[in-house]
Amino acid sequence: MARYRGPRLRIVRRLGELAGLTRKVPKRSYPPGQHGQARKKRSEYALRLEEKQKLRFNYGVSERQLVRYVRKARRVSGSTGQTLLQLLEMRLDNTVFRLGMAPTIPAARQLVNHGHILVNGRNVSIPSYQCRPGDVITVRDNERSRRLVETNLQNPGLANLPSHLELDKSTLTGRVTGIVERQWVALEVNELLVVEYYSRKV
């Protein structure tokens, strides 16, 4: 399944707030569609599917990518759900977003794809690059790149900088100081339901 490129507010109405996907707030609080306002009890499968979709749409990953992350998380000792969230949170596009250098994850992905972002002084144009403690994230030294990021920093997508990141606005430099902790994940999601969803599929 390819990355979603359709109307973002429809997704937010169906799944709830997704800070990584869009900053816009839907006018209607109920899900889209003819029967959006009807309340009916959802099955356990539907609940698991919804939590999985939250991850997919918030982080902008394809179904195939998410399956790979689940497999990778299972190979690590500890909580599979928390490891899965850490893998998604430590992606370069999400890190650029959490630093405030882009208003959304799709916008951060575009900055990375277009070569505006450097990691440890090298051009990294792969949004899925896994950031590690010690990585230094800077903006390419040209006027257009700096102007883009400076504008975004004036109105970041999320107000609070997570504890594993540092930002020097004067030099447009971000540092990864550790691995993200669960309480800093800016998404209301039950990761255990996501793991359960994939338990028979992966």
UniProtKB/Swiss-Prot annotation:
SMART domains: Ribosomal_S4 (SM01390), S4 (SM00363)
Superkingdom per UniProt: Bacteria
Family designation: Belongs to the universal ribosomal protein uS4 family.
InterPro entries registered for this protein in UniProt: Ribosomal_uS4, Ribosomal_uS4_bac-type, Ribosomal_uS4_CS, Ribosomal_uS4_N, S4_RNA-bd, S4_RNA-bd_sf
Residue span(s) of domain S4 RNA-binding: 90-152
Subunit structure: Part of the 30S ribosomal subunit. Contacts protein S5. The interaction surface between S4 and S5 is involved in control of translational fidelity.
Keyword Ribosomal protein applies: yes
One Pfam family recorded for the sequence: Ribosomal_S4
Protein name listed in UniProt: Small ribosomal subunit protein uS4
Intrachain S-S bonds: none
Keywords: Ribonucleoprotein, Ribosomal protein, RNA-binding, rRNA-binding
Transmembrane stretches, start-end: none
UniProt key word rRNA-binding: yes
Summary of the function given for this chain in its UniProt record: One of the primary rRNA binding proteins, it binds directly to 16S rRNA where it nucleates assembly of the body of the 30S subunit. With S5 and S12 plays an important role in translational accuracy.
GO BP term, pick one: translation
GO terms for cellular component: small ribosomal subunit
GO molecular function, one term: structural constituent of ribosome
SUPFAM superfamilies xref list: Alpha-L RNA-binding motif
NCBIfam families given in the database record: PRK05327.1, rpsD_bact
Record organism: Thermosynechococcus vestitus (strain NIES-2133 / IAM M-273 / BP-1)
